[in-house]
Amino acid sequence: MSDSEKLNLDSIIGRLLEVQGSRPGKNVQLTENEIRGLCLKSREIFLSQPILLELEAPLKICGDIHGQYYDLLRLFEYGGFPPESNYLFLGDYVDRGKQSLETICLLLAYKIRYPENFFLLRGNHECASINRIYGFYDECKRRYNIKLWKTFTDCFNCLPIAAIVDEKIFCCHGGLSPDLQSMEQIRRIMRPTDVPDQGLLCDLLWSDPDKDVQGWGENDRGVSFTFGAEVVAKFLHKHDLDLICRAHQVVEDGYEFFAKRQLVTLFSAPNYCGEFDNAGAMMSVDETLMCSFQILKPADKNKGKYGQFSGLNPGGRPITPPRNSAKAKK
């Protein structure tokens, strides 16, 4: 019997959730075999599902988490722990924060437990060459061993890349690509795959919108491109979509609109790295595709954990206009 068949998921999830309400930073040490089992079983499920997911509302969409495990628990407290709500995460689960292992293990455990209600996309940090440098490798090496980090790499190489919600909301981690002409191109990407230095897969995980760019521009990250509002409008029109939902950039209010509200950036790690005073946000999409935003305020700046206000209805006017906020690049 393989590790994945022996997984006691309820026990694993129970232990991961036990630290709720504890001082942030308290670790949960699963066994190496349990973690390996989570990686192997979730990898199997990722490969059994499409690389371009076709999802149905209602669901909640979350942006970058970056190892901020206690903030992930706050998101679930606020949005409802699975299976109470359906979730789509847009990538960047690991690196930078202190508890990448707890974060990714809980997400993988929920994926295995609720495979049709819980979805994870790949971010640019779910890539060996990136998380080797920005913290995840060191955390794996310190708490377990390098072999386990390699097992995570094999799992990450099988994550789906994009999702379309009810044929109207296109979701990915980074953004658009000059190479993307048809959705079939995404469907044709074979897994497992590393993230290449350029091309369609790279762009979907790395590109950024830029209000000062017309068409396509150079990206300050040194990878991929930036794209302007007209690129967004043309893409939506061509594919009969209403909205692009992406993550990948710190935004002050946890969410930020672009291109006349045709694109929204979500970032779900409040007080990112302890260096930014940003809120985190989660976007709730109801059955009518009305989108509203649930806000996690920066924890230490506010007595109340949460704030909530509603946002856009794709193709319509928002209830609450977005506040202007400065973007910070990760």
Curated annotation (Swiss-Prot):
It is found in: Cytoplasm; Nucleus; Nucleus, Nucleoplasm; Nucleus, Nucleolus. Binds 1 Fe cation per subunit. Its main location: cytoplasm. The gene is Ppp1ca. It is an enzyme of class 3 (hydrolase). It comes from Mus musculus (Mouse). Changing D64N: Dominant negative, severely disrupts circadian rhythmicity of transcription. GO terms for biological process: branching morphogenesis of an epithelial tube; cell division; circadian regulation of gene expression; entrainment of circadian clock by photoperiod; glycogen metabolic process; lung development; negative regulation of transcription elongation by RNA polymerase II; positive regulation of extrinsic apoptotic signaling pathway in absence of ligand. GO terms for cellular component: adherens junction; chromosome, telomeric region; cytoplasm; cytosol; dendritic spine; glutamatergic synapse; glycogen granule; nucleolus. Phosphorylated. Dephosphorylated at Thr-320 in the presence of ionizing radiation. Its cofactor is Fe cation; Mn(2+). It comes from the Eukaryota. The keyword Ribonucleoprotein does not apply. GO terms for molecular function: cadherin binding involved in cell-cell adhesion; iron ion binding; phosphatase activity; phosphoprotein phosphatase activity; protein phosphatase 1 binding; protein serine/threonine phosphatase activity; ribonucleoprotein complex binding; RNA polymerase II CTD heptapeptide repeat S5 phosphatase activity. The modification Phosphothreonine is found at T320. This is Serine/threonine-protein phosphatase PP1-alpha catalytic subunit.
